[in-house]
């Protein structure tokens, strides 16, 4: 088996992210990643404009994030845009499965903060669904938002963003444990939800979830049966096969790399 380190749940200028795909790829290379999966909101523009492939030495793949207000769902390895359906997310799940993709319930539990987007949350609300492949048990931007519990702490976190990162979401872990105990083939995922947005704090420009930081945080490591070859199609298949079969783990690589864990 060959170990490769990647990062999923990333937004670019094709939706509400601050970076172009080529800029994001360059940051991923600097962080020592082997692959990234861009998941812009409600579109596959990057895929259809030929952004997939090796850029700056890193394998760039394009998926998408479906739904806007709630029931966010990551759709990986799909060719056609999956339509939003927040009121019936099972329809979204079924469409990803029809395309033989990988579907992941994203940031299912959020508390929100009145100091960040006026308390908005994007939780998963329908747990009667079935046939999804994964649950995002660790999402950096969700934890960052939830930790903004006061004005002073919010300012502190803006300038010390890693302080908002603690551990995987216990509620999401509990649900994953319950489903796996029932014999369901559902795997753990994690990501930063990187947007690379620039805001102003007084006169100072500050980046929220900068790519160069996020790519050292919640990464996903896979075990591939074959060495990545540099061929886009072959290597995509290797990465997605590993994810589908659960030959992967997630880890915070900020303080110490988890390379070689398995």
Residue ranges and their predicted role:
Residues 156-160:
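Flexible glycine/proline-enriched surface loops and loop-helix/loop-strand junctions
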Residues 1-153, 166-182, 191:
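A metal-dependent hydrolase metal-coordination microenvironment
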Residues 1-3, 182-188, 192-262:
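C-terminal functional module detector
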């Amino acid at each position: 088996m060959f170990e490769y380190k990647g990062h999923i749940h990333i937004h670019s200028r094709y939706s509400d992210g601050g970076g172009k795909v080529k800029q994001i790829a360059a940051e991923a290379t600097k962080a020592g990643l082997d692959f990234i999966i861009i998941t812009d909101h409600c579109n596959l523009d990057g895929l259809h404009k030929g952004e997939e492939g090796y850029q700056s030495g890193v394998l760039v793949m394009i998926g998408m994030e479906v739904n806007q207000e709630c029931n966010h769902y990551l759709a990986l390895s799909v060719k056609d845009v999956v339509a939003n359906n927040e009121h019936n997310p099972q329809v979204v799940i079924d469409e990803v499965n029809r395309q033989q993709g990988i579907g992941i319930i994203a940031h299912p539990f959020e508390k929100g903060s009145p100091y960040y987007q006026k308390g908005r949350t994007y939780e998963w609300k329908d747990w009667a669904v079935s046939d999804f492949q994964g649950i995002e048990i660790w999402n950096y931007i969700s934890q960052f938002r939830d930790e903004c519990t006061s004005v002073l702490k919010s300012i502190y976190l803006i300038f010390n963003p890693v302080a908002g990162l603690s551990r995987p979401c216990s509620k999401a872990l509990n649900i994953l444990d319950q489903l796996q105990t029932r014999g369901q083939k559902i795997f753990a995922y994690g990501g930063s939800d990187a947007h690379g947005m620039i805001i102003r704090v007084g006169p100072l420009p500050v980046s929220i979830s900068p790519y160069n930081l996020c790519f050292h945080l919640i990464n996903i490591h896979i075990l591939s049966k074959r060495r990545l070859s540099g061929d886009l199609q072959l290597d995509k298949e290797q990465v997605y096969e590993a994810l589908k079969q659960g030959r992967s783990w997630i880890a915070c690589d900020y303080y110490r790399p988890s390379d070689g864990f398995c």
